[in-house]
Amino acid sequence: MASFITRAERSGNIFSRVTGLIRAGQLNWADRPLWYDVYVSSPPLTPPDWNVKLAKYDEPIRSIFYEEDVLRAKFYKTYRSTAGIQVDSSRTSVSQQFINEYKLVKSENAEATDDQLFEMTQKRLNENGIVLK
């Protein structure tokens, strides 16, 4: 019955599909699902509409990038980490130390550009003994 219809091209709700299978003889009346009799005896007040377009259907999906995510991506692009990140470790990772230091530098130098802040953070971490490779 529905071999030519994919799930993306739905042929109707599940009730109409099961009803079609029963009428076509593909599903025995005795083998019908438990919910079928309940649905027949008390159908929904409004018919189910499976082809509803939501309010924001045509709007593109917004990119959500937090400042920390962009900074972490730039850090890993500049310094490719060869060491594994241990999730259960109590020590903060080098990238997290970089981000924390970046926030401190940014609070001290509010007028600096992102590239200048990145370079100042590199210098400050090198002065503190954290080697960035």
Curated annotation (Swiss-Prot):
Family: Belongs to the mitochondrion-specific ribosomal protein mS23 family.
Subcellular location: Mitochondrion
GO molecular function: structural constituent of ribosome
UniProt keyword annotation of Aminoacyl-tRNA synthetase present: no
Pfam families: MRP-S23
Record flagged with keyword Ribosomal protein: yes
Gene Ontology cellular-component annotations: mitochondrial small ribosomal subunit; mitochondrion
Name of the gene this protein is made from: mrps-23
GO biological process, one term: translation
InterPro entries: Ribosomal_mS23_dom, Ribosomal_mS23_met
Protein name: Small ribosomal subunit protein mS23
Keywords per UniProt: Mitochondrion, Ribonucleoprotein, Ribosomal protein
Signal peptide residues on this chain, from the entry's feature table: none
Top-level taxon in the UniProt lineage: Eukaryota
Subunit (UniProt): Component of the mitochondrial ribosome small subunit (28S) which comprises a 12S rRNA and about 30 distinct proteins.
